């Protein structure tokens, strides 16, 4: 009996919803066209709630640290099969405040170097001090080179070019008349064509 009562009440509610006048559910169209051509879902749709993106970018992890971070939101799904990149492997270092991400090859290379250094220290072998520069002659040459603004090296071409421009400026005053006549003759020949006709 109770199931039949529920069915009757459900039918009455759905029938009451169907009996709403069209003015409440569809907007009036002043141009005389039928109002069925307008999509009512787009007019009355509610704004969509935006959720957290489950795959945060590892480079912005510190910026979005307040949000809950799950490295693998779907435990049964392998990210490699989905074509997504896995986040980098953080280094095991106490001095780093935030994790530094490297790829797998870099990580294994770092581990190999650490192991070899640990073996050398265990054998009490002194680690060679690195030279401050590779070649003494290059260092001495760099010391002798002239430097410009900001400590950068000056190019020899630019230095020679600057001196040549100054010399040319003084000599151009003396020969300005001769050069202007040569330029005008070259211009006249270029405009006249190969046979001397314009």
Curated annotation (Swiss-Prot):
Tissue: Expressed in stems, caulines, and senescent flowers.
Annotated signal sequence range: none
Main location: nucleus
Xref: InterPro entries: CCAAT-binding_factor_CS, NFYA
Keyword terms: Activator, DNA-binding, Nucleus, Transcription, Transcription regulation
Biased composition (Polar residues): 24-44
Gene Ontology terms describing biological process: negative regulation of DNA-templated transcription; regulation of timing of transition from vegetative to reproductive phase
Region described as Disordered: 1-47, 136-198
Compositionally biased residues, Basic and acidic residues: 7-23, 156-166
One cellular-component annotation, GO: CCAAT-binding factor complex
GO molecular function: DNA binding; DNA-binding transcription factor activity
Coiled coil: none
DNA-binding region: 131-156
Subunit structure: Heterotrimeric transcription factor composed of three components, NF-YA, NF-YB and NF-YC. NF-YB and NF-YC must interact and dimerize for NF-YA association and DNA binding.
Protein name: Nuclear transcription factor Y subunit A-4
Organism whose genome encodes this protein: Arabidopsis thaliana (Mouse-ear cress)
Highest classification ranks of the organism: Eukaryota, Viridiplantae, Streptophyta, Embryophyta, Tracheophyta
